[in-house]
Amino acid sequence: MNFIKKVIGGGSSKSKTDIKIEDEQHEQQHEQQHEKQQIPDKISTSKVNSPCVPPTCTYISKENVRSDLSLIKDFNSAYYYNYYRTLEKNSTNLLTSPGLNTKVVSNQFTLKEFNIVSEMTDSCIVSVWTQKYSNLSLTPVEAVYQIPLAPYATVSDFSVILKDKVLKGKIKENEKAKEKYNDAIASGGQAFLAEKVEGFFKLQIGNLPPQEDVTVNITITSEIGTHLESLHFCLHRFIFPKSAFKFNYTLNASLSTPIETIEMDHFQPTITYKDESKTNATVTISTENGVSNNIIAIIVPKYSEKPESFIEYSPIDKSYALAINFYPKFSVGLDEVDQKSEFIFVLDCSGSMSGKPIEKSKMALEICMRSLNENSKFNIVCFGSNFNKLFETSKHYNDETLQKASEYINRIDANLGGTELLEPIVDILSKESDPEFPRQVFILTDGEISNRDKLIDYVGKEANTTRIFTYGIGSYVDKELIVGVSKACKGYYEMIVDNSDMEEKVMKLISIAMQPTLSNIKVDWGVLSNVVQSPAQIRPLFNQERMMIYATLDKEPTEKQVTVILSGNGPLSERISFPVDLDFSKANQSTSHIHTLSAFKHIQDLEESERKEKKDNKDKIVKLGKRFGLVSKHTSYIVTADSDKVTEETMKTVQVLEPTQQINTSPGSGSGFIPTTRVQGSSSVFPSSPTPLSGPSPYTVCAPPPPPPTSSPYTNCAPPPPQFSRCIAPQPYQSAPAPPAPPAPSRLSQAQSQMDYCDQELLCESLEGDLLVEEEELECKEIECSPPQKLSYITPFAPTSQISQSSRECRSKKSSSPTIQKSSSLPSRPSTSSSSLIEIIRQQKANGSFTKSSVSSFINVDTPPPSSDIPEDVWTTLLIIANFILNFDSQKSQWELVSQKATKFVKQQIIKSSIASTFETLLESAKKSISN
């Protein structure tokens, strides 16, 4: 018996216009909220019951792992969607593409029917696209279109049905495939070419005779999109023509654990569970009006506390392929975390940072330095027209390097001219990362750079080795630089408009970076031999991330039941092992999906080796492409057929994704790219740089912002050149100097420049509208919501808890992190000055302790401890923690990590010195001493 969740006969009864309007409203609401949700909530510190028992990592209960559904559905925050987010951001670049204004008769070559059948498992998804085209032209045509092909997807099969003949595509080297295509066209025959071109899938249907129909079958193999504990499958609206056509979609999900929920916005699908176990489900959609919205299937499986494995067997070559899927969660107090990590802070020291921005940044850096633990490595990089570094390479964190960092920070000034960020980032990321110390980079900047897209493309290629956090300072910062760089490397970002809260916002991201991590992950394959693992280097598993590993075995294993060991460095700096049981006797023989995806991931490793190590892996890539039928940078699919009648007429070239006179600007309207007619010899409608969207658009939205009396009427417009100041400060490891910076423009000239710029660009608002809705600044004041709702805190490695709606509505879009209600059992006191707090924090040693002599000018340290067995530095550190709680409650975000490190030191000393009192008892005594 089938279990039906929803049954909707055929497609939705709503008109296409109604759907578009609803989609616009949904997308606008969604964009206004997703930035607020993109940073995980702060995590409460769990208490240790006994001071004499070392903390341990344990799995958390299933009841604590489920995220709020609105966060699970927030696909904009998912890493896999960053590719499409970038396309959406830059889709208006195509307004300047050649041939935009060329008119194509829409009924010459049309898509009549589009069917997609997808097979989803826990590790991969394979989709077969069947597209039926009709050529009503009186002359032969060459049809050309390109669709986005995400970097985690590839074409793995290709065939054509022409005149009732099924023509199977063959993988060839790119050059040979193109030669064969051109030869077939020149001889009057038909040809079909499928290839991957710089991030897009390009399909050419050549020399299709008049009045002939053709059916194209394409198989796309892809990794599963993941977000929090959910699995996503996205069919972006940009892949569909804007015309009406019949569309049928079937998704067959077969998971290893029961399915808890299936969600799909914009559509009312039929969802059928095959049995009561709910491990298998079928989702179907049908419509006669084409597709104008994203199709995103969101499946939430039941949480599994252990790695899951999936095995395939290929009887053709007697090989096995397997996938390992793991979403770990640990329960460990933040003051107990002692994991290794590398922290690199990159600070903008251009002239425009002079004054309060650079001073506040230096204060924030001082706090960051005291928040690191002794298992860290770190470095500081200052950049402008050139850059310099604290150390040539990152150094281990100790009292000596901490002192050098403080001296270096004290010398920092806004004296480095312009804003050239690419060079220092390349210098950082080109150095081989240490898997023992996961690399995390923090960038603080207030400007914009000329090579933004090149930078985003570059850092995106390093996402497996590095996580990047970004801070945008001030009103003139390039927001897409801040958002794009962080999302490309699976990091987070903050927009800092008001310098007064800079330290708080900087520490929010530092707190995220400190959350428990599983790093230096390796698989011990044991008795298995000739294992090809991909990716070869496994990315560290940060909070709320899922790991996917693939492997192929060309030989039969000697044993049918094998246990391999997945291991990594845990949050307590210990080595943690997870056994993974493999039963080869139960291998699936009906599909080759994991074989294909494993080969694709291996090809990606080889291509990355070509990029970084300059190796020539073309022969290996071509061999894998031919064996598994994969399109790559070196391989394409080709189909040729001799025509019954040689075509001698002139062939017309048309775009399948045909242009339209009316430019839809809603992000939910399915407008996407503005396609154009392809004429012989013209360049592609799509950009041709390594990044699908490189190159700044000459069109910029300058929609007027809301008019609060204190804000400039031009704050949303493109800024004039940044202001510079000139001064000299000694800096170690100076890079090559740059020419002198230009003189600073006056504020009046800046405002006039903005006014002139916006006057020239008002046309863009009507052209683009909501396409760049994420760029619109909703000038909501950052006020304390009244009354704010408390958040229910969760343990480390648990997904974000729900954020109250009132908090979301009160937040500014310039801040992407959720508003957190501070919890304290003590009443709030008037805060002492921020400078006083910074001076206290500066006295902390690398191990987290404070000495009596260093803090005697800030607090009364002469109060004796409650017992004589308490060492002086332990009691002094307790007094400082109590002082933070009692006198700096309103600045908790600044000292919270400093206090956690101090707490960790005290707890370690309690165990080491066999002190009878618990930490909580001693802290209460310290509070009483501070209060007296």
Curated annotation (Swiss-Prot):
Domain VIT: from-to ranges: 95-222
InterPro entries to which the protein is assigned, alphabetical: VIT, VWF_A, vWFA_dom_sf
Species lineage: Eukaryota, Amoebozoa, Evosea, Eumycetozoa, Dictyostelia
Polar residues bias (residue ranges): 677-686
Ranges annotated as biased composition (Basic and acidic residues): 15-39
Annotated Low complexity bias: 815-834
Short name of one Pfam family: VWA_3
Chain segments carrying region Disordered: 1-49, 661-752, 800-834
Organism per entry: Dictyostelium discoideum
Entry superkingdom: Eukaryota
Protein name: von Willebrand factor A domain-containing protein DDB_G0292028
Residues of the VWFA domain: 342-521
